Amino acid sequence: MLHTLMTSPFRCDLSAILRLLAAGDDVLLLQDGVIAALDGSAPLEALLKAPINLYVLKEDLEARGLLAQISPRATVVGYTDFIQLAVRNPQQMAW
């Protein structure tokens, strides 16, 4: 399943979202959700403990000036990769 997190991790119930993730799920951070991938942040550490694949949309990082502050443990992807994730995951949940 593809989970897209579009809100800041400080404006949503990230712990509830984490409980709904299953092993092997893809999680894409976009819009203000990219804040969750800041290197050393508590939201990032929580996401990395989950058995998921973590992706961050490059264009949204650039729009917020955060590209250099993102953890190397998160995979930065573009819109083409976003489409591939959507095709690979027929079931999707937007947060």
UniProtKB/Swiss-Prot annotation:
GO biological process: one example: tRNA wobble position uridine thiolation
Database matches in SUPFAM superfamilies: DsrEFH-like (SSF75169)
One GO cellular component term noted in the UniProt record for this chain: sulfurtransferase complex
Subcellular location: Cytoplasm
Keyword tRNA processing among record annotations: yes
Alphabetical keyword list: Cytoplasm, tRNA processing
Keyword Plastid in annotation: no
Quaternary structure annotation from Swiss-Prot or TrEMBL: Heterohexamer, formed by a dimer of trimers. The hexameric TusBCD complex contains 2 copies each of TusB, TusC and TusD. The TusBCD complex interacts with TusE.
Free-text function comment from the UniProt entry: Part of a sulfur-relay system required for 2-thiolation of 5-methylaminomethyl-2-thiouridine (mnm(5)s(2)U) at tRNA wobble positions.
Family membership noted in the UniProt record: Belongs to the DsrH/TusB family.
Protein name (database record): Protein TusB
UniProt source species: Erwinia tasmaniensis (strain DSM 17950 / CFBP 7177 / CIP 109463 / NCPPB 4357 / Et1/99)
Gene this chain is encoded by: tusB
